[in-house]
């Protein structure tokens, strides 16, 4: 199967391209073929003469009477091609007289010849189209008919619009024709020109004396632009024209006619006169700050300057001039060709008007003056702003006596004020002082009361100790005087009792038994129980207190002479031993020898003090000191952490006690420990 040759590559079109209408992008088309002389003569398009595919030739001269529509083609157009929209022929322009417009003969531009690959078609021939290439065979064996070919037709050519109007003057440039004699090539007449005089009325008369005011230079609207350039305003320095404003066409320098008017109305108006500032307050000080008008001479000079610069400008009357005044005559400048023979009338003095700040209406002058006078009088007689010294003003007082009286009164008020401040300050100082003294007195009373209470407590305690001492001495003497036949026991307690009473009770109880002990039985029971429970090997023995409930239970049981110690805690038994020594009514070392004991520094002094104590007390020491020395041995101390110093520190309060409370108890405790340590070291 032979391959079809590729379609010829078309070159870029060389003709014109229509602008897009209604947002439809038109494709460029090839230039139409050049029309023949016969077609030009008959003013017909090639579409009517030739084929249905050749585009319409543009015609330079449009005949309104000849308008024909091309027949519709039988070939199906592509969806992308532009629709064949019928275009209306523009209306025939007419001139001012109602006749056909005046046209100018223009040279027809010759279109370039069509490309070589475009073949001319006859009405009976069909267009040559490239063959359709089928990319895939049909599904069935039957051969399907090929789809109709798609022909891309060029869009219809645009309707030739008439050329822009060209102004052709019918006469020479020396004499300007009227607006009615001007002819436009496009058929559009120029608007009539209305000239106005200095008084504002229309000037329709032609004055031969001043050709510049009544004649219009020839207008030339060239075919390139069709619109004259904008005028420019300048001042002519010619004395004959009186500095009148002129409008000159900028194209006049190129030789074309220009439009000038020396008596035209000025385009620029002078700025409005300054409006004086208004104050919203009735204060005369602020009301006096209005912008006052200048002097008459300055105003006349300014207005003369304005008149000399712009004679053709009619200024309106100033807003502050009373027009109803008979002296006011508006000044109107004369014509340009006439000299000024009269001087302007005198300027009426301008006075600022008082206007309402709400609706900007003029206030009644007389009423305003009355209000201003009333306000000034009120301000001068008692409503002046406050001064350094309130309530009074020296300006109000007219005589010197009143001023002196006022000054004296002020001085008196100042003295009274200072006196009140001084009294108030003294009163405050006295109150502060009294309050401070009262507070110090209360603190001193509290201190005295506290000291008194402490002294009472000391005296009461000392008295109680003396009573106890006297009572114990009397009881001991009475017990010694008892007959042997009397078997009554005064105190059977073992704790909180004297050593002599405990030994007497113990002898009475041991009379029934064959053996007797020289020291209390409780010492033997407690020390043996501690050794049986491995007390010396228990860490912190005699230093760690046992259970308080167990100690109280066993204490009550021993006081009832029940010596069955049913406990397995060596700390409870060690606590009972220390408690018995502390609760003795008289300590083992008598209180009379306390000061000598803490002052002893050698073993001889300690031996001398021991020789002075009673025999029963010596028996207790002879039993207790060897036991303490045994417990503090080094082979026990490595387990119990209780060496001789620690043991002496624990038992010194039970062996030595002072009956007088002093502040040197902590210092004396060290001396007590040294005394007990010396006793333990002296033990065999």
Curated annotation (Swiss-Prot):
Coiled-coil segments: 399-473
Keywords of the record: Coiled coil, Cytoplasm, GTPase activation
Single GO cellular component term: cytoplasm
Annotated Low complexity bias: 54-84, 94-110, 118-131, 168-188, 197-226, 233-264, 293-311, 472-486
GO molecular function, one term: GTPase activator activity
Marked site: Arginine finger: 543
Predominant localisation class: cytoplasm
Record has Cell cycle as a keyword: no
PROSITE patterns referenced in this protein's UniProt entry, alphabetically: RHOGAP
Location of the protein in the cell: Cytoplasm
Biased amino acid composition, Pro residues: 1-10, 144-167
Region (Disordered) location: 1-283, 292-311, 403-489
SMART domains: RhoGAP
Biased amino acid composition, Polar residues: 11-23
Domain Rho-GAP stretches: 497-684
Domain of life of the native organism: Eukaryota
One GO biological process term: signal transduction
Composition bias type Basic and acidic residues, residue spans: 404-470
Gene3D superfamilies in UniProt: Rho GTPase activation protein
Family annotation (Pfam families): RhoGAP (PF00620)
InterPro entries in the record: Rho_GTPase_activation_prot, RhoGAP_dom
UniProt function note: Rho GTPase-activating protein involved in the signal transduction pathway.
This protein's name: Rho GTPase-activating protein gacO
Gene (name only): gacO
């Amino acid at each position: 199967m032979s391959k079809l040759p590729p379609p010829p590559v078309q070159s870029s079109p060389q003709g014109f391209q229509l602008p897009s209408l209604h947002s439809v992008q038109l494709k460029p088309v090839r230039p139409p073929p050049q029309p023949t002389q016969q077609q030009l003569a008959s003013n017909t398009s090639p579409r009517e003469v030739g084929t249905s595919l050749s585009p319409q030739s543009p015609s330079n001269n449009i005949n309104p009477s000849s308008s024909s529509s091309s027949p519709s083609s039988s070939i199906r157009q592509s969806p992308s091609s532009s629709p064949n929209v019928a275009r209306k022929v523009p209306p025939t322009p007419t001139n001012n007289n109602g006749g056909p417009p005046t046209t100018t003969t223009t040279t027809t531009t010759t279109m370039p010849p069509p490309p070589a690959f475009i073949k001319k078609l006859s009405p009976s021939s069909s267009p040559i189209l490239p063959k359709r290439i089928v990319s895939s065979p049909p599904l069935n064996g039957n051969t399907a008919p090929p789809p109709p070919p798609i022909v891309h037709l060029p869009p219809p050519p645009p309707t030739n619009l008439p050329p822009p109007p060209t102004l052709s003057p019918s006469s020479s440039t020396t004499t300007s024709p009227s607006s009615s004699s001007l002819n436009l090539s496009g058929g559009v007449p120029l608007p009539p020109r209305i000239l106005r005089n200095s008084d504002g009325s229309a000037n329709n008369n032609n004055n031969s004396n001043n050709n510049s005011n009544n004649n219009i230079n020839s207008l030339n609207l060239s075919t390139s632009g069709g619109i004259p350039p904008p005028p420019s305003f300048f001042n002519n320095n010619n004395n004959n024209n009186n500095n009148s404003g002129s409008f000159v066409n900028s194209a006049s320098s190129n030789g074309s006619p220009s439009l000038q008017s020396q008596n035209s109305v000025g385009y620029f108006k002078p700025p409005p006169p300054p409006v004086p500032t208004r104050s919203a307050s009735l204060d005369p000080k602020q009301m006096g700050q209005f912008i006052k008008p200048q002097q008459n001479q300055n105003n006349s000079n300014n207005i003369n300057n304005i008149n000399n610069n712009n004679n053709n400008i009619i200024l309106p009357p100033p807003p502050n001039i009373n027009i109803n005044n008979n002296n006011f005559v508006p000044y109107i400048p004369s014509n340009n060709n006439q000299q000024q023979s009269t001087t302007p009338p005198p300027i009426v003095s301008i006075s600022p008007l008082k206007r309402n700040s709400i609706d900007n209406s003029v206030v009644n002058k007389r009423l305003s003056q009355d209000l201003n006078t009333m306000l000034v009088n009120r301000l001068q007689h008692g409503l002046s702003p406050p001064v350094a010294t309130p309530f009074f003003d020296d300006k109000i007082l007219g005589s010197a006596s009143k001023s002196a009286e006022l000054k004296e009164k002020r001085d008196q008020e100042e003295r009274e004020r200072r006196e009140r401040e001084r009294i108030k300050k003294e009163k405050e100082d006295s109150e502060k002082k009294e309050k401070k003294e009262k507070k110090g007195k209360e603190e001193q009373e509290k201190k005295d009361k506290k000291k008194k209470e402490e002294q009472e407590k000391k005296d009461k305690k000392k008295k109680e100790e003396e009573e106890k001492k006297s009572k114990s001495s009397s009881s001991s003497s009475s017990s010694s005087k008892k007959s042997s036949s009397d078997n009554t026991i005064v105190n059977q307690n073992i704790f909180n009792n004297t050593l002599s009473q405990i030994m007497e009770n113990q002898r009475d109880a041991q009379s029934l038994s064959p053996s007797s002990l020289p020291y209390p039985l409780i010492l033997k029971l407690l020390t043996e129980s501690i050794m049986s429970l491995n007390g010396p090997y228990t860490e912190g023995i005699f230093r760690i207190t046992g259970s308080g409930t167990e100690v109280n239970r066993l204490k009550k049981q021993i006081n009832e002479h029940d010596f069955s110690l049913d406990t397995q805690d060596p700390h409870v038994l060690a606590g009972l031993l220390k408690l018995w020594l502390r609760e003795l009514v008289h300590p083992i070392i008598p209180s009379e020898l306390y000061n000598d004991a803490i002052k002893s520094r050698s073993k001889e002094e300690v031996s001398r003090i021991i020789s002075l104590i009673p025999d029963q007390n010596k028996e207790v020491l002879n039993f207790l000191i060897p036991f303490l020395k045994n417990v503090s041995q080094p082979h026990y101390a490595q387990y119990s952490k209780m060496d001789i110093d620690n043991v002496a520190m624990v038992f010194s309060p039970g062996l030595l006690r002072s009956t007088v409370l002093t502040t040197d108890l902590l210092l004396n405790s060290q001396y007590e420990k040294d005394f007990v340590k010396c006793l333990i070291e002296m033990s065999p």
